[in-house]
Design a protein with these regions (language model features):
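Structural signature of Gram-negative outer-membrane beta-barrels, strongest in the C-terminal barrel
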Residues: 252, 347-353, 357-363, 369-490, ...
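Short acidic/polar hinge/loop motifs at secondary-structure boundaries
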Residues: 115-143
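Conserved C-terminal beta-signal and adjacent last beta-strands/turns
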Residues: 8-12, 23, 90, 202-205, ...
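Flexible loop and strand-edge segments within Gram-negative outer membrane beta-barrel domains
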Residues: 25, 219-225, 229-244, 248-335
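N-terminal periplasmic accessory domains that precede
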Residues: 37, 72-75, 95-98, 107-110, ...
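Outer-membrane beta-barrel signature, preferentially recognizing the C-terminal barrel domain
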Residues: 276-297, 331, 433, 437-491, ...
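Gram-negative outer-membrane beta-barrel transporters
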Residues: 176, 391-398, 485-489, 509-583, ...
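Extracytoplasmic beta-strand/coil segments of soluble accessory domains associated
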Residues: 73, 77-115
Length: 650
């Protein structure tokens, strides 16, 4: 403990040291960023953040570079109002994304504006392990129900991942390699079991832009399941490959065509369950995406088409304790997405966005417990939608829209939203903006929930409603404050009901309405342009379905540049108590909640640039205080680990 306190003192001292330093160049850089800040996909088109009444958080390229060596889910877990269950578990274990107390099925993932899902999954939610952080330029998180523009799954929020663009040079490239430890708090090791390398080649040849990327990751070091014995279980492994090719051609200033080809794959071993080892379970997942995006600008607006096909194959083998053999599961799914969008500007203050979205999903499953025929397990949707944006000259911005969801299985469903932003004060001394929104959303039943042996073809979509109200404010050049209150209602949730006769269970819509209220607040204090600290707090109060959702989460970050080209950042998180309903008494008394205690994590990142920024050395320490805790009952989490790497631009 004394050693841990000394480490904390050292970190704080380092931050205070940075308060004595100041860089005019950095100050000008930051000021320009604030002036030019835009939200790229809040309305599917560029829009200044001050003109939207939605809560939006952006992870910039600077944030990504500052956290070199991390994964997408590790960065998202630092965002206020987001909790990723399993983020610090063995990489082979599935992750769950909770936004404002919701579940993964209620958080829609986009890549360059294209919605992604897993048609083979029980809830059809996308696996964020399939994308490498090194591919990404920035990430935007749009909070609240957002189905009007984005369709099914946008119940609690939208995570829009924007991939890197090509350099204006003829040829540019980046090569990065990193090595790190991977161990639990009880079984520390100096072995370098966390390995990654990636390379990117991009550039511009006349009117053609190109960007090619390839990434390899390997990970081992500890078992997924937690051992109750003094001897740990055998190690579980994880390896992944990611590659993409992106091309863009500008015919003229009005017409542009983009195309992409993307392949992601990972292999993993996994255990038999909580506190239960296995040396035979293994899995594989592959994703192949291809798409085009023609875009035309005209005098009063622009129009584009997003057309993509996503093919996903999953398979795994698991030990069957009853038969003494292994069960094999094979899942194959395909999703087709066509989104035709037009923006027309009637005046500089008023624009109308119209679109029509077509999607088709199908699933084929082969297993010892029954098959799913793709000729049966498929559905399609045709959704027309409209959204209007009006920006007044006195600081008020209004955004309102609606969508008609036409589903081949359950019929029609209507959603709508409206949001307001009102800039009360805006000058060099103080800015104050009020925001408010009321929006609805839907989550369509998955192919598995509809067409498996446990499925019910009469399922209705889950509906979500969000109301939120808050403010953004800046006081001088040092203080920035924001806070928002939200209330969500969930109805028609798809649940699994046990039955006394075969097949002993079936999916159905719940009669219960789930009420969720919460507060998100953060404050940023710019002590100097070289030392910035941000403290955030999220509170979630949910009436039911609360497994693993913390009621309280506190975050604090410190960013310091003590000397030129050196950046040091720390991130502190305190995750409050969580509960798990133990229906069968597996971990205690049947029918009672198991309480997981709160825990705190402190991470540190260091970056140093040389050769005019062409070479970047980076390092990190995660869980610096080596805290032992459980994210999921019966499974290990990472202890104190170290990583170091180098990035070379050419």
């Amino acid at each position: 403990m004394k050693k841990s306190k000394n480490v904390c003192v050292a970190v704080v001292s380092l931050c205070l040291f940075g308060t004595q330093l100041f860089s005019q160049e950095k100050a000008q850089e930051k000021k320009m960023e604030q002036l030019e800040e835009i939200v790229i996909y809040a309305t599917k088109f560029e829009l200044k953040k001050e003109n939207t009444g939605k809560v939006i958080y952006k992870i910039s390229q600077k944030d990504i570079q500052r956290n070199a060596g991390k994964s997408v889910i590790e960065l998202l877990n630092n965002v206020l109002g987001i909790e990723i269950r399993g983020v610090n578990s063995n990489p082979g274990e599935p992750r769950s994304t909770y936004i404002r107390g919701g579940r993964s099925r209620q958080a829609l993932v986009l890549i360059d504006g294209i919605p992604l899902s897993d048609p083979t999954g029980i809830e059809q939610s996308y696996d964020l392990r399939l994308i490498s952080l090194n591919q990404i330029e920035s990430i935007e998180i749009l909070k609240g129900a957002s189905s009007t523009l984005y369709g099914s799954g946008a119940g609690t929020g939208v995570i829009n991942i924007i991939l890197k663009k090509a350099s204006e040079n003829t040829v540019s490239g980046v090569y990065e390699v990193s090595l790190g430890t991977n161990a639990t708090s009880k079984n520390s090791t100096s072995s370098l079991n966390d390995k990654n390398q990636n390379i990117s080649i991009n550039g511009t040849l006349d009117k053609l832009k190109y960007n090619a990327f390839f990434n390899i990751t390997g990970n081992s070091g500890f078992s997924s399941a937690k051992s109750t014995l003094t001897i740990p279980f055998e190690e579980d492994t994880y390896s992944s490959n990611n590659g993409f090719l992106k091309l863009g051609y500008e015919f003229n200033t009005q017409l542009r065509m983009d195309a992409f080809l993307n392949y992601d794959e990972f292999d993993y071993t996994f255990d038999a369950g909580a506190y239960n080892d296995s040396d035979v379970n293994l899995g594989n997942q592959e994703q192949f995406r291809i798409g085009i995006r023609p875009r035309l600008k005209y005098k009063k607006g622009e129009v584009f088409l997003n057309a993509s096909i996503n093919s996903l194959d999953r398979s795994f083998e698991s030990f069957n304790s009853f038969s003494g053999g292994t069960n094999v599961f094979i899942y194959k799914g395909t999703s087709v997405n066509l989104d035709f969008v037009n923006k027309y500007e009637f005046t500089k203050n008023f624009q109308l966005i119209t679109g029509i979205n077509y999607q088709k999903h199908e699933n084929e499953s082969i297993s010892d417990f029954g098959n799913i025929d793709p000729d049966l397990a498929n559905f399609n949707v045709v959704d027309p939608y409209v959204s209007a944006v009006y920006i007044t000259d006195f600081g008020l911005s209004i955004n309102a829209g609606s969508r008609l969801n036409i589903h081949s299985n359950y019929g029609n469903n209507f959603v709508y939203d409206t949001n307001l932003a009102f800039g009360i004060v805006k000058n060099e001394t103080i800015t104050l903006k009020l925001i408010s929104s009321y929006s609805t959303a839907f989550i369509a039943p998955s192919l598995y929930q509809l067409f498996s042996d446990y499925g019910a073809t009469n399922l209705a979509p889950e509906t979500n409603r969000t109301f939120e109200f808050g403010f953004d404010s800046k006081l001088g050049k040092q203080w920035a404050l924001s806070a928002v209150y939200y209330n969500r209602l969930e109805e028609n949730k798809v649940i699994f009901q046990n039955l006394p006769t075969p097949p002993y269970g079936m999916y159905a819509n719940a009669l219960e309405t789930i009420d969720v209220s919460g507060i998100e607040a953060d404050v940023t204090f710019t002590i100097s342009e070289e030392l910035i600290t941000t403290v955030g707090y999220a509170f979630v109060d949910k009436t039911s379905d609360i497994d693993y959702i913390p009621k309280n989460k506190l975050t604090a970050s410190f960013v310091v540049n003590p000397i030129k080209n050196l950046a040091i950042s720390t991130m502190f998180k305190n995750v409050g108590k969580r509960s798990f309903f133990d229906a069968f008494g597996s971990f205690g008394e049947a029918g009672k909640d198991v309480i997981l205690p709160s825990y705190s994590l402190l991470d540190m990142n260091v970056n140093y640039k040389v050769l005019e920024g062409k070479v970047l050395f980076f390092g990190s320490i995660t869980n610096l205080l080596n805290e032992e805790y459980e994210e999921t009952i019966g499974f290990n989490t990472r202890g104190r680990n170290f990583k170091m790497g180098i990035r070379i631009q050419f």
